[in-house]
UniProtKB/Swiss-Prot annotation:
Gene Ontology terms describing biological process: actin filament organization; regulation of epidermal growth factor receptor signaling pathway
Origin species: Homo sapiens
Name of the gene: AQP5-AS1
Pfam name, any one: MIAC
Note: Inhibits head and neck squamous cell carcinoma (HNSCC) progression in vitro. Also inhibits renal cell carcinoma progression in vitro.
Subunit structure comment from the entry: Interacts with aquaporin AQP2.
Protein name from the UniProt record: Micropeptide inhibiting actin cytoskeleton
Renumbered residue ranges of the record's region Disordered: 1-22
Length: 51
């Protein structure tokens, strides 16, 4: 049950996790930027239909 055989595993994993975090953040930003026009279009379309 000892993990002394993989000493260089945790720093690599932390860097990978940090990279994934930054990528997910940028993906979230880009997804919101691309989703806003669609949301505005849907809202205006719904208002036009309702009115």
């Amino acid at each position: 049950m000892e993990r002394a055989g993989v000493p260089g595993f945790s720093p690599r994993r932390s860097s990978v996790e940090a990279k994934m975090q930054s990528t997910s953040c940028s993906v979230r930003k880009s997804s919101t930027v691309t989703a806003w026009p669609a949301v505005v279009l849907l809202l205006s379309w719904g208002q036009r239909r309702g009115g």
